[in-house]
Regions:
Chain B
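Phosphopantetheine-dependent thiolation modules in NRPS/PKS and related acyl-activating systems
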Residues: 1-41, 45-48, 60-97
Length: 235, 97
């Protein structure tokens, strides 16, 4: 076992780049955290309190492999941040079956499977936390993103139902829905389209990583035990 | 892995359950009723017991099985009704592999 018993063990998915990497780095900066990350590519984080596993979470077997590795290495888990996700900005009629499968497999199925397996470990700790990622595109019902928005709407429903199912085990489940964040996920979207999304928000600006971290910190606070089944949108 | 091993795994899981439910202890006997009529477990208790058994099967025998599949809930007699019925169910499930 490599973690100290008083360390908080946080599993973040999709940590090779973008928001996931910044989330992992944020919790590594704070004292007393052990961060476990995973992605399809090699680790880009170097820190003694970071463990990286290279795997494709859209495959059912990868979820089991990951949990077996965590059980063997730390055998503890306090927080799961389901960050991994793929986006596709395409009209339904232009979405290929392969792309639809990929979006549902990564954005929905992997989250459901990992939440199921990780909860078995998290329930052994007090004040367990599961945090999912959604998007403002869901409440805005953005056209041109039907499959992506559908996968995130499903995540929001999953968040609310699992909040009820897991509360008996002391686990809260919440989600944060950022507005447009300057990451690879939106790099191919024309600026005028991003501006059109931003114009529909209450606060008309990009979401920064600090905005997201603020909500994650809030969900993870010990005092947030009654904050459960909530979706917080940014913007 | 024989039936006695499986009974022992169930008893270990019952130990876990009893530790967190000292006011509702479950006897470690083969005829103990677990779930359903006169059973000691409510639905949440059943979930905890199933998870504990699955974990101990994995830890002690490297067997990764899911006990609560569709088949389990469609059988005429619940496989979770008593310790002995559950042991038979697990034994057959592992034998299937």
């Amino acid at each position: 076992m490599i973690n100290k018993s008083n360390q908080q063990v946080i599993l973040v998915t999709g940590t090779s780049k973008g928001i996931g990497k910044l989330i992992a780095e944020h919790y590594l900066k704070l004292s007393n955290n052990l961060v476990i990350g995973c992605s399809r590519s090699k680790s880009s984080i170097s820190n003694n309190n970071y463990i990286h596993y290279e795997l494709d979470l859209s495959k059912n077997s990868a979820v089991n492999d990951l949990m077996i590795k965590i059980r063997k290495s730390t055998n503890r888990l306090n927080v799961l941040i389901n960050n991994v996700g793929v986006a596709s900005m395409n009209h339904l009629l232009l979405s290929t079956p392969e792309k639809i499968d990929q979006i549902i497999d990564v954005n929905l199925k992997s989250v459901i499977n990992l939440t199921r397996e990780a909860s078995k470990l998290i329930k052994k700790e007090k004040n367990g936390r599961i945090i999912n990622m959604t998007t403002v595109a869901s409440p805005l019902n953005l056209e041109g993103e039907s499959v992506y928005v559908s996968s995130k709407a499903a995540i929001e429903a999953f968040t609310k139902v699992t909040a009820k199912e897991l509360s008996a085990f002391g686990i809260t489940v919440n989600a944060v829905g950022p507005g447009p964040v300057k990451t690879d996920l939106i790099k191919n979207i024309p600026t005028h389209k991003i501006n059109r999304i931003i114009s529909q928000l209450s606060s008309k600006s990009y979401t920064s990583i600090d905005d997201i971290l603020n909500i994650l910190d809030f969900f993870m606070k010990k005092e947030s035990q009654l904050v459960n089944g909530q979706i917080i949108y940014l913007g | 892995m024989n039936k006695e091993d499986i009974i022992n795994i169930i008893y270990l899981a019952i130990d876990d359950y009893n530790q967190i439910n000292p006011n509702s202890l479950i006897a470690k006997e083969s005829n103990t009723l677990l779930y359903g009529q006169d059973g000691k477990l409510d639905s949440l208790g059943l979930v905890n017991l199933i998870l504990a058994i699955e974990e101990k099967l994995l830890d002690n025998f490297n067997k990764s099985i899911s006990l609560a599949d569709d088949k389990a809930f469609s059988e005429k007699t619940s496989p979770f009704s008593s310790v002995s019925v559950l042991a038979d169910f697990i034994y057959n499930k592992i034998d299937d592999k």
